[in-house]
Amino acid sequence: MKVRVDADACIGCGVCENLCPDVFQLGDDGKAKVLQPETDLPCAKDAADSCPTGAISVEE
């Protein structure tokens, strides 16, 4: 499984980072970055479901 963030869709709200700080971090550009794309996938799925713009995808 892989976790990805669509930087064009990300608005930098920080929901993903708050839910999964080991997986996501807001970068210098204010957009979410994936720190560990293959770690804590249940948490990453929760973040994807909570992302207001649908910028996070979890591919199985």
From Swiss-Prot:
What GO annotations for molecular function exist for this entry?
A: 4 iron, 4 sulfur cluster binding; electron transfer activity; iron ion binding
The keyword Electron transport is annotated on this UniProt entry: yes
Answer yes or no on keyword Hydrolase. Answer: no
Q: How is the cofactor bound?
A: Binds 1 [4Fe-4S] cluster.
Keywords in UniProt for this one?
A: 4Fe-4S, Disulfide bond, Electron transport, Iron, Iron-sulfur, Metal-binding, Repeat, Transport
Q: Which cofactor does it need?
A: [4Fe-4S] cluster
Kindly give the Gene3D superfamilies that the UniProt entry links to this protein: 3.30.70.20
Q: Which residues form the 4Fe-4S ferredoxin-type domain?
A: 2-29, 30-60
Which pairs of Cys residues are joined through disulfide bonds in the record? 20-43
Task: Give the binding site residues for [4Fe-4S] cluster.
Answer: 10, 13, 16, 51
What this chain does, per the entry, is described as:
Ferredoxins are iron-sulfur proteins that transfer electrons in a wide variety of metabolic reactions.
Q: Could you describe the subunit structure of this protein? A: Monomer.
The name under which this protein is listed is Ferredoxin
| Organism the protein comes from | Thermotoga maritima (strain ATCC 43589 / DSM 3109 / JCM 10099 / NBRC 100826 / MSB8)
